[in-house]
UniProtKB/Swiss-Prot annotation:
The gene is hemC. Binds 1 dipyrromethane group covalently. It comes from Nitratidesulfovibrio vulgaris (strain ATCC 29579 / DSM 644 / CCUG 34227 / NCIMB 8303 / VKM B-1760 / Hildenborough). It catalyses: 4 porphobilinogen + H2O = hydroxymethylbilane + 4 NH4(+). Belongs to the HMBS family. One of its GO terms (molecular function) is hydroxymethylbilane synthase activity. This is Porphobilinogen deaminase.
Length: 315
């Protein structure tokens, strides 16, 4: 029987995702493959007292995991796609992108049913500049406060009354079966998600032809098209997942998609949104074209200001 090792972070959500892929592999190749998990701490897991946007560097949640792939101590890695940098280390590639979970965000609150129901000056917790910008574009009166930690930690702080509301990825809440007394899904087009949000990426070495064949069943072409378009947009902006950039692609036919991209300033006062359509064969290039449009329409100036303010490090 063939044995595979999945490298993963140790958070509840990361472990759920790795266990999910483990189960799919062992079911598809029943009696032929068994899978174990190798838990690895990343820089992003260790540095918890600094907002993510200020930690700096690429691959905050993947670098140490990729090192395990390169040194052979793990066969494959399961990542949240929104954490995966645009450029992968030489010798590694994203072999599979499974079917995507809902990419939206969710507002959670103990007392208030929706974003519109929050009182003036309400304290809203999020570690994401993308969420901050879009929240302030809709509600300039809100007091946005940095909130780091795993899903459980953030929910506990909400339940303990430290915040009137918090915003988290819908996919993580659904995967872990978590909720709060009140919640509102903040979905496109009103509120755009991070590039790749809700999708998983299976990374392994390019020279592992055995894994290409064995794991091909995991790849979901519509999800790959959407994610490649979104990642093209982010690459064209030379941005990371900690910058006020959002991208969301949807399939409009068997091989056709539409992508909407957004760049905003930190206060949500200037928001640039543009849309393009494309086909699977040119997904990444259409994302790059959308980035060029957005940059020409003022996003370059906005991003320069964000980096100059020190709110985020240029990737």
């Amino acid at each position: 029987m063939k044995h595979l090792v999945i490298a993963t972070r140790g958070s509840k959500l990361a472990l759920w995702q790795a266990e999910h892929i483990k189960s799919l592999i062992e079911t598809e190749h029943a009696g032929k493959v068994d899978v174990s998990l190798k838990i690895i701490k990343t820089k992003g897991d260790i540095i918890l007292d600094v907002p993510l946007a200020k930690v700096g560097g690429k691959g905050l949640f993947v670098k140490e995991i990729e090192e395990a792939l390169l040194d052979g101590s793990a066969d494959l890695a399961v990542h949240s796609m929104k954490d995966v940098p645009m450029e992968l280390p030489e010798g590694l590639f994203l072999g599979c992108i499974p079917e995507r979970e809902e990419p939206s965000d969710t507002l959670l609150s103990v007392r208030y049913a929706s974003l519109d129901a929050l009182p003036h000056g309400a304290r809203v917790g999020t570690s994401s500049l993308r969420r901050q910008s879009q929240l302030l574009a809709l509600r300039p009166d809100l007091d946005i406060i940095s909130l780091r930690g795993n899903v459980d930690t953030r929910l506990r702080k909400l339940m303990d009354g430290e915040f009137d509301a918090i915003v988290m990825a819908t996919a993580g809440l659904k995967r872990l079966g978590l909720a709060a007394p009140h919640h509102e899904v903040l979905a496109p087009p009103r509120f755009l998600p991070a590039v790749g949000q809700g999708a998983l990426g299976i990374e392994f070495r390019e020279d592992r032809a055995d894994l290409r064949d064995m794991l091909a069943f995991l790849d979901h072409r519509p999800t790959r098209i959407r994610v490649e378009a979104e990642r093209g947009f982010l690459a064209g902006l030379e941005g990371g997942c900690q910058v006020p950039i959002a991208g969301h692609a949807v399939m409009t036919g068997d091989d056709n998609f539409r992508i909407e991209g957004l760049v905003a300033d930190l206060k949500g006062e200037r928001v640039i949104r543009r849309t393009l359509e494309g086909t699977g064969a040119n997904a990444r290039n259409r994302g790059l074209e959308l980035a060029s449009q957005v940059l020409a329409d003022g996003a370059a100036e906005i991003l320069d200001e964000v980096y100059a303010s020190g709110a985020a490090d240029r990737q």
